[in-house]
């Protein structure tokens, strides 16, 4: 059972020395995300939220954060376009979040600096629609003639 030729050495899953080096692939790239999975992993470990941290937890959290950011930016972009602006400002973020039911509930306790307030006028303070119609009706009616005297 002797083999002739070169003897292969085991490298325990590593590449043998002298093999061409491949470029490293980040966890974010593997997961197909834009948000940094490695950085979120570091923050979760540093924060000591739990004794141990699963491998999928930071990937899942990065995906959730990326989805929320995309949702808010989409709505804020629509708000900016409605105001005929090409740049998103804090006001557009506030309008987008407060006008969306689910995001408004999620971020109800959040104050956005330079966001202002939602435009809201109490219905009692609005002019009554019926008040304008009687004035028009009086102007269009023909004047009442007094009875003729004999």
UniProtKB/Swiss-Prot annotation:
Task: State the Gene Ontology BP annotations.
Answer: heterochromatin organization
SMART domains from the xrefs?
H2A (SM00414)
Spell out the subunit comment: The nucleosome is a histone octamer containing two molecules each of H2A, H2B, H3 and H4 assembled in one H3-H4 heterotetramer and two H2A-H2B heterodimers. The octamer wraps approximately 147 bp of DNA.
Q: Where is the composition biased (Basic residues)?
A: 1-12
The annotated region (Disordered) lies at 1-27, 129-150
Q: What is the protein's given name?
A: Probable histone H2A.7
Mark the residues carrying the PTM Phosphoserine: 146
Annotated Gene Ontology cellular components are: heterochromatin; nucleolus; nucleosome; pericentric heterochromatin; plasmodesma; plastid
Origin species, per record, is Arabidopsis thaliana (Mouse-ear cress)
Which keywords does the record carry? Chromosome, DNA-binding, Nucleosome core, Nucleus, Phosphoprotein
């Amino acid at each position: 059972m002797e083999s002739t030729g070169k003897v292969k050495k085991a490298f325990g899953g590593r590449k043998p020395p002298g093999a061409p080096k491949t470029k490293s692939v980040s966890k974010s790239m593997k997961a197909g995300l834009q948000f940094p999975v490695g950085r979120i992993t570091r923050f979760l470990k540093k924060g000591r939220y739990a004794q141990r941290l699963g491998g999928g937890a930071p990937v899942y959290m990065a995906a959730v954060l990326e989805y929320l950011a995309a949702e808010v930016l989409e709505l804020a972009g629509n708000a900016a376009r409605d105001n005929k602006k090409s740049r998103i400002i804090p006001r557009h973020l506030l309008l987008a979040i407060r006008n969306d039911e689910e995001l408004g509930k999620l971020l109800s306790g959040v104050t956005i600096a330079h966001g202002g307030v939602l435009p809201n006028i109490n219905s009692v303070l609005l002019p009554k629609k019926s008040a304008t119609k009687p004035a028009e009706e009086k102007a269009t009616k023909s004047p009442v003639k007094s009875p003729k005297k004999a």
